[in-house]
Amino acid sequence: MDLSTLAAFALFVAVMTGTPGPGNLTFMAIGATSGYRTAFPVIVASQLGSLVLNLCVAFGLGQVMAEGGPLVTVFKVLSMTYMAYLAWRIVSLSIKPKGDVRLPSFWEGILIHPLSPKTWAMSLVAFTTFFAGNGLALGENAALLTGGLLIGGTIAHSIWALVGVSILAVLGDGPLLRATTITMAGGMLAATAWAMLL
């Protein structure tokens, strides 16, 4: 892989991981309602899930998903169901008293990317555009794909969570924060539905 291709991949990662999607909106909402300390373990978990997804794409599952069929239909149902559950969890953080709601867990974070249509699309496009047929061994391509998306995802999710913390500092823990959190949860569902149509 030459330097210009690597630079193009880095730009792709920065744009794709930095734009709104289920993961980024989730972490902004967690940051806004519970702070960065609460968001960070879930960010780590989400990146472990992303790592597994990207390895699966690199080793052939991406091609199976790209061909469509019953597996993709099952994925879409699971994806929308999980994102609806996640949206409800995010809204619960802002409308229930602090002691009455369980914070998002490590295990809930692991499923964010494997069930995110945006992440699947991003991984498939990255692999086919920058790594397919480039002359490197499959293991090398898998390492570059997963490493690049892991770094980009961790940075982007952290930035979005810190934006959420800033929202909390500005709005305080009241009706405006609740309205903002509900809007973010709705945005996450809309982003998921939109990604399914692409």
Task: Map each language-model feature to its residues.
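Juxtamembrane transmembrane-helix termini in multi-pass membrane transport proteins
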Residues: L3-P70, V125-L145, L149
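Hydrophobic residues within the alpha-helical transmembrane core of Major Facilitator Superfamily
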Residues: A14-V15, L48, A84, I110, ...
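Alpha-helical transmembrane segments and their lipid-water interface positions
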Residues: G23, G49-L61, M83-L86, W120, ...
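Hydrophobic alpha-helical transmembrane segments in multi-pass integral membrane proteins
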Residues: N54-A58, L115-T128, G186-L198
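Flexible cytoplasmic inter-helical loops of multi-pass small-molecule transporters
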Residues: S92-S105
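Selective transmembrane alpha-helices of multi-pass membrane proteins
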Residues: A66-I95, L150, A156-W160, V170-L198
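Hydrophobic alpha-helical transmembrane segments of multi-pass membrane transport proteins
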Residues: N141-V165
